[in-house]
């Protein structure tokens, strides 16, 4: 009986340890996804050209996508409020497609990358200042 109790206790401890390790792994996955989704790239006024900082961020995202090979993402193109709705929708699309093309060139499969343009419709900052406009000229990434 003592041996059976010892084996049962050992199994319970092992199960607890495995559950704890799984919870830690799950927490790390959630944190990595949040980091992925919370890091936008930004653009200059009236431009879809990638800055060196944007390229660095996209390289990090490509590395994450290569280790999380089943994940698909949506790249959202956003603009500041200057310009017509139609123009900003087109510019937002160019921004999303520029980011998509760069990720493809880094080895990410195009089938995993979706794009959408929101133009000026979803500002990150509703202020009417250059600082607010700068925050709104972005590509945002969500994990599908």
Spans of features found by a protein language model:
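Periplasmic peptidoglycan-binding/tethering modules of Gram-negative envelope proteins
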Residues: 1-72
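Periplasmic OmpA-like peptidoglycan-binding domain that tethers envelope proteins to the cell wall
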Residues: 76-142
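Generic structural signal for short, solvent-exposed loop/turn connectors between secondary structure elements
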Residues: 41, 143-144
